[in-house]
């Protein structure tokens, strides 16, 4: 279990979650754990699916970027965060935060310049 935990910690520290190619198989290979154990670990220890966990990490990064760079393009941000499309990004952002990225900017007082 400690090998997997160490691999997950490294995955977060290096922001590998932003790279769409760094998926669950990448972590399984790096940690050397069995895929069934990986699934068990996320279900029972993390109490969420890997994809949900990774999307949450990406959304937290999105919030940091939006607050620091209010004029950021949502399309560019979606690609930078590994969401692929702005629609996918908006869907996950609203699901996690309860607001669209634009609403989040307005709430935080980081209005986009007109």
Regions found by a protein language model. Name each.
Residues 1-9, 55-63, 86:
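Short, leucine-enriched amphipathic alpha-helices that occur as contiguous helical runs
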Residues 35, 39-53, 83-84, 93-102:
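HTH DNA-binding helix-turn interface
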Residues 69-105:
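Sequence-specific DNA-binding recognition helix
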Residues 1-19, 36-37, 109-114:
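Inter-domain helical "communication" segments and dimerization helices
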Residues 7-9, 24-35:
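Hydrophobic alpha-helical packing segments in soluble, helical-rich domains
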Residues 27-28, 38, 77-78:
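Short alpha-helical "recognition helix" segments of helix-turn-helix
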Residues 44-80, 107-114:
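Terminal helix-turn-helix DNA-binding modules in bacterial transcription factors
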Residues 5-22, 42, 46, 63-72, ...:
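Basic, amphipathic alpha-helical hairpins
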């Amino acid at each position: 279990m400690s090998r997997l935990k160490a691999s997950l910690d490294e995955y977060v520290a290096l922001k590998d979650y932003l790279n769409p190619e760094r998926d669950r198989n990448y972590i399984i290979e790096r940690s050397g754990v069995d895929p069934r154990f990986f699934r068990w670990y996320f279900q029972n220890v993390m109490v969420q699916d890997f994809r949900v966990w990774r999307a949450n990490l990406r959304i937290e990064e999105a919030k940091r970027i939006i607050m620091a760079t209010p004029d950021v393009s949502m399309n560019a941000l979606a690609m930078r965060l590994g969401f692929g499309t702005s629609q996918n990004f908006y869907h996950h952002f609203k699901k996690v935060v309860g607001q669209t990225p634009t609403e989040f900017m307005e709430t935080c007082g980081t209005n986009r310049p007109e």
